[in-house]
Structures are given as C-alpha cells and as structure tokens.
C-alpha cells in the first residue's frame, strides 16, 4: 500500500497502474471520502486515484444541514441561523433552534479546502478524465477512461445514473427541483436571524411547492423556488414564481447577483444492491440522499466516517449498506406523496404544527428514538399511511 506499481498486462499489452482505491467523481462524497481515507491510520498510506471530468468546479452546489454546537465545516460556512420559519395556509411558526443551528455551506470553499488537504498527501492522485466504464473482475477492478485504463482493489463510484431510476417501477421517483436567485437590495429588507425553511403560501397547483429564503445580510439573500414533484418546469415558471413572491413581500428593487438551479432525486430505491465485492456506490449514487427531503450533506459526513471505520476494521464492503426503519418511513412517505402530490403542504404542516422542533429535526436527521417517531407519524393522516403500508406489505403498491 502506498506504492504505485506499473506492470504489463499480457492479455491487453497495456501498462496498468495498480491502486488501492479509485474514486469516481470529485464531488462532495468523493472528495470527503478521499480526505477521510488520507487521515485514517489504517488507510493514509493507501494509493488513491480520484477521477473527475470537470477541473473547474465553482459554486455548483449549496448544502444546508442542522447541527448542534461547533462543527467540522464551520470555518467554511456562508451563514448559519438560530431560527427557522415554517409557513403554510394553516400555520405560521418561527422555531427557535436553541443550541442547534441551520447551517449553509457553498461548494467552492469546500472543494478548495479538500483539494488543498488532499494535495498534501503524495499517495493521492487527482486526474481529470471522463470514465467510460468499469468491471469488477473478482480480484480487482478495471476502470476505463477516455485516455487510460486503471486497475484497483476497490472502486468507489459517486457518479449518479438517472437511468437506474427510470428503468424501474417498484419505487416512486420524485425530484426536489429548484431555481434560486441570489439577490441584493439597496435597503435592508431581510431578517438575518431567521431562515424561511418552507413557505407553502405560494400557489400549489396540485403539487408540493414552496419558497425557501436564506438571508446572509439585511440586503443579501437566496430566494429559492422548490418543488417535490415528478416533472421539471420550464425555467420561466420558476423565475415567474420568484418574481411574484418578491413582489408580494414588497421587494421590488433588487439586483440579481447569481442563479442556482438543480434537481435532486427523491427515491427509496436500494442503490446498494448494485454494489459488488470490490465496487461500492457512494453519495447520491449510493442512496445517501435522504429520500423524503433531498438532504445529502449530513449523510455524507456520517457515511464517510462510518465507511472508513468499516474499511479500517477490514470488514467486507458487502456488509456496510443496510436498510433501517428510516428507509421504510421515507418509502411510505414517498408512496403517499407521489400519489397525492397536492397534499405536501398539508403533510408538512401537520408535522411542524404538532411536534417540537427538537423532535422534528432529530427525526429528519435519523437520530430519533422509536417513541418520538410514533409521535411524528401520528401527525400524518393515519388511514392514508396505514393503507399504503399494507399495500407495500402485500406487494400491491402500483
């Protein structure tokens, strides 16, 4: 481990570089896994190759998460809030998070820091090559790019493939799709202490639609129009919704500084079933996105730590990914939301209206106890969820 070996493969007559780990994709999960492997006593001398197609990563992502006290990424935060607001036609609730904060991290400083840290480890290479395929040979993995062929003991793949979801019918597929405007106003209009977590007072149009407002200063904020639904909108429809929302808030004079747009898969599909002896899917490609909310970053933190501990203990990768009760909760929620997409505001209003903030955020963070989860579930229309549970149980959910 830690030594790059070049040898001649007689069958292909190619010189292949033998590596311990190859990581496909240099995004949040790939870089963080490489970083943690490089810091692990058991793995820090391992030879690691990160393959990514884009050398110029900018602020292509914004990650938000709840955290109590100080955290690993605090020095990189764009902002954090001690209060969040939930609003719908039936409830308007500002939640004091106490010793917990809602934190926002933009991707560029994160990428820059991890690339800097990784560059200090001579056992890690970073190459900008597009992967064209890979194959688990049992004793090793062959990885092909447009320029080269590589061989490794273990491959971690963070490249998400939408076709996996499109080619199956067993699990409903929604998207958390959004368009956000970073705006600057000439006069103070924003409450910097409070993030608007969900504002369902916007027209729902028989879907689950809400506004998300993250103020950085009294004159700077991200205004994001978000949907949990099956199909994307035309860009003009997102933009029109944001304009209408700002107009309703009497924010008419502003400069559009930056635009952010994206789509996150919301599905309980068991991505881990594509893992093999030596190939492990990570990040959204591995099902690390919280299916019912689209949150990913906190899971990446937990999963990369657990995965490196797992590898360090010489445990087989096949034993790493397991279903838990939260997977089932997400599956039932998405079953209901996909069939009754117009009920999203009602479902979230019930949860936020009938539960304490601590209970809600522990539940969404998959850190709650079973009794707390029972109380959360009582917030939802019981008959609807029980009916869907039995459909799943007896395989009649289609």
Predicted regions and their residues:
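N-terminal FAD cofactor-binding segment of flavoenzymes
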Residues: 50-88
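C-terminal helical "tail/cap" subdomain of flavin- and related membrane-associated enzymes
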Residues: 305-398
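Short beta-strand to alpha-helix junction loop
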Residues: 97-116, 229-237
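Predominantly flavin-linked oxidoreductase catalytic cores and closely associated redox partners
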Residues: 125-246
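N-terminal Rossmann-like dinucleotide/flavin-binding domain of flavoprotein oxidoreductases
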Residues: 81, 85-91, 106-125
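Extreme N-terminal leader/targeting segments of oxidoreductases
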Residues: 1-20
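N-terminal Rossmann-like FAD-binding beta1-loop-alpha1 element of flavoenzymes
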Residues: 19-44
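FAD/FMN-dependent oxidoreductases across multiple families
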Residues: 131, 203-205, 229-306
């Amino acid at each position: 481990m830690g030594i790059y070996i070049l040898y001649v493969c007689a069958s292909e007559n190619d010189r292949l570089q033998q590596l311990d780990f190859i990581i496909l994709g240099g995004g949040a999960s790939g870089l963080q896994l490489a970083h943690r492997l490089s810091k692990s006593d058991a793995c820090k001398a391992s030879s690691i190759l990160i393959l990514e197609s884009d050398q110029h990563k900018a602020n292509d992502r914004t990650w938000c998460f709840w955290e109590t006290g100080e955290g690993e990424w605090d020095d990189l935060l764009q902002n954090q809030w001690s209060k969040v607001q939930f609003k719908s036609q039936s409830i308007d609730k500002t939640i004091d998070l106490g010793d917990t904060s809602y934190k926002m991290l933009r991707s560029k400083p994160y990428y820059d820091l991890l690339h800097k840290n990784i560059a200090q480890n001579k056992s890690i290479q970073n190459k900008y090559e597009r992967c064209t395929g890979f194959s688990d040979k049992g004793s090793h993995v062959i990885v092909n790019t447009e320029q080269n062929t590589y061989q490794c003991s273990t491959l971690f793949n963070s490249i998400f493939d939408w076709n996996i979801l499109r080619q199956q019918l067993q699990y409903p597929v929604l998207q958390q799709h959004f368009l956000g405007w970073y705006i600057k106003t000439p006069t103070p209009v924003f409450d910097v202490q409070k993030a608007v977590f969900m504002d369902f007072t916007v027209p729902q149009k028989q879907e689950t639609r809400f506004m998300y407002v993250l103020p950085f200063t009294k004159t700077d904020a991200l205004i994001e129009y978000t949907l949990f639904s099956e199909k994307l909108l035309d860009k003009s429809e997102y933009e029109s919704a944001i304009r209408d929302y700002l107009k309703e808030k009497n924010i008419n004079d502003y400069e559009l500084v930056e635009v952010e747009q994206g789509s996150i898969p919301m599905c309980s599909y068991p991505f881990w079933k594509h893992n093999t002896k030596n190939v492990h899917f990570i990040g959204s490609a591995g099902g690390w996105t919280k299916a019912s909310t689209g949150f990913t970053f906190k899971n990446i933190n937990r999963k990369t730590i657990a995965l490196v501990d797992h590898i360090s203990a010489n445990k087989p990768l096949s034993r790493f990914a397991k279903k838990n009760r939260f997977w089932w909760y997400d599956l039932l929620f998405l079953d209901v939301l996909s069939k009754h997409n117009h009920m999203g505001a009602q479902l979230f209003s019930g949860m936020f209206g009938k539960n304490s903030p601590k209970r809600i955020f522990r539940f969404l963070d998959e850190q709650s106890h079973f009794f707390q989860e029972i109380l959360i579930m009582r917030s939802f229309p019981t008959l609807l969820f029980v009916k869907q549970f039995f459909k799943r149980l007896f395989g009649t959910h289609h």
